[in-house]
Amino acid sequence: CNNAQGRCDGADFKKGPMTQLLIQLLEPLLGYSLADFPESFAYVSETALCAQTKATPARLQPTRGKKKGVETSYFYGNAMTLGRMAFDLAAEVGDSVVAIFFRDTDGTHSSHTGLWQDKWQSVCDGFKHSDFTRGVPMLPKPKSEAWLLCLAGFNPGGTCEALEELSGNDHSPNSVKSRLDATLGRHHSADELCEWLIQHPVAVDRIDSMPSFRAFHEALISAVKNFPI
């Protein structure tokens, strides 16, 4: 946010690489580019979302069974809060709203096999609990740089699924971030990555080989289905 606040929209919203990716994915679905309508975006930071979740009255607080860990309860509760915010925003502006719940999942080799799926399901359950029907989990595995690395030409002629097994730890000698920097020739800022994506339109068929992206893309398509144009 350009206003140094936890919530912003319109001119105060500063897009990042994943927003640029989203713009490109939505254009063929909507028939127009959201880049031409910057006022269409509203942003809630992770800090602001957590604060709102904690401020929710006890009777509306999310409840999870004991078998659900603290981490997945976090995803569930914040998705529920975001869904309620989106529901209220749709009523306020008198228009349809899609809520994107974006988090890097930062998995490591020590993470149990189903952790990503647990987080994904927790976000879906949180949206469902809020009664918001256009909620979309966006959970890159292990993090968004893996999606960008795929688009940058990882494994030419092959698939990118192996990228999801890399460590999300930035201090790892073979981290996703360091590999992206190496592939692009140097470190790129968020603004530079946005510009790079504009110059290199998303190859959906290629990045769709990554299960975490495919799940997100399918959820996005479902959310905008029958969307009023």
Identify the residue ranges that each predicted region occupies.
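Acidic beta-strand-to-loop metal/phosphate-binding motif
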Residues: 1-2, 95-108
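Charged phosphate-binding loop/patch that engages nucleotide di/tri-phosphates or the phosphate backbone
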Residues: 190-229
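Well-ordered, non-membrane alpha-helical segments in soluble/globular domains
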Residues: 12-22, 73-87, 110-126, 213
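A glycine-rich, hydrophobic loop/mini-helix early in the fold
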Residues: 48-96
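Domain-level signal for Mg2+-assisted phosphodiester chemistry and nucleotide/NA-binding surfaces
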Residues: 1-64, 74
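Short helix-terminating capping/connector loops at secondary-structure junctions
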Residues: 35, 90-96, 129-133
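Activity-critical C-terminal alpha-helical subdomain
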Residues: 104-189
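Acidic carboxylate-rich catalytic motifs and surrounding loops in phosphoryl-/glycosyl-chemistry enzymes
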Residues: 34-49, 137-146, 195-203
